[in-house]
């Protein structure tokens, strides 16, 4: 079914909010009984993972998954990632894991890594975009894993935001964007990684050997994969818009805050190199380490200088910039270093222009 053919669900009463403390396992298990039941019944429940908040639906319930697409305005060709409780449970949606996939799971699961694997026929086409593969992940966030256990079913869960907009890293982001269109939000506090999972296709055979095809940069870097002994290759280029994709997050326009983003550098005195028009419109700044030179900015977001800290805070900063009413946001250019590849990809797809 094409995205344009899906019924756009009308707003309904605000989603239920279930607040949990990830450090209190017993109380969290009790609090997740109800949302687990709602997921089995075909309802939509947003929940925290270590990467971003996901919009969960029973991955084996085609009608529930179709509602995810409708709520997000997501095109049908864009496959979803299925979240399972453990590597052993991956075979609920994927055929037997190859030795290469098992080694990868042992090293990086639970964690922010998605494997694209041959699907089982029980997985509805709507989950996979009609492909014969399915993306599978075991999240490391304790609330996510307890919710999957409470539901008793694998959860198809894209980011809990309208398609192409900034992903949510807090429960409030979800309420602001989808709160009147879904059934519940499990509030487990802010996420810790801050961007989506890395996606790899696991390939092995006499013609290709054993290798990982890196389809999306994310919470696990290429360097980490290679340091663990895996052979990693990348596609030459993204596939054409609208074509079937093996990975989500590869649409050219994505993660966008609705404000033009313009890259800027630093002057020799360390201040941001901002334009100085005669009558500047309200502008925002997104900088690393300090906001020197941005004294006239209507909104100034200063993130840590290290890649982990910057990544963790990026989407929250973009949400604040989107809400600031500024006409443009000047973004400090990132280091040209492989460690920054994932966050640079997000900013490029968000519309960052140099």
Predicted regions and their residues:
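Active-site-adjacent structural elements in enzyme catalytic cores
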Residues: 2-354
